[in-house]
Amino acid sequence: MEKENLQAFLAENAIKPASIAYAASKRFRGEDGQPIEWKISPISNDENKAIADRNRKKSFVPGTRETQINFDQEQYANDIICACVVYPNLNSAELQSSYGAVGAGELVRLMLTPGEYQDLFQAVMQANNFDVGMDEKIKVAKN
C-alpha cells in the first residue's frame, strides 16, 4: 500500500477559490454595448458562519418557556450577496445615492429585478461551491 501523502492538503498547496465574472443584468451596458460583468469573490467558512449567525434569531414560543431559533433566509441571501460582490462596489456612496439606497443590501435590491436578484444569488452560491451535489462528489471520488 502506498504511503499517504499529505502534501496536497497543506494550506500553501491548496488551490485558492477563484473569483467569477457574472453579468447580473443586461440593463447595465458598457461603452461597447455589452452587459457589464459583476465580479463575485467567494468568502471563507468563518465569514459565512458570521453571516448565518447574524440571521438567526432566538424567540420564545408563546405560552411556553421554550425558545425557538428562526433563520431569516431572505436576509441571509442579501448579506451573502453583499459580502461576495466586489464589483460594482455596493458600498459606494455615489452608487447608493443614485438609487436613493441606504446600505449595500438595499442598493442591490433596487438595482436588480427580482429575477436578476435570484440569478445573482445563484451565481454567488456557485462561486462558493454550494452548487456541487453529493452525487457528483461521490462520482468524482469513485473515479
Predicted stretch roles:
Residues M1-K16, K137-N143:
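Low-complexity intrinsically disordered segments
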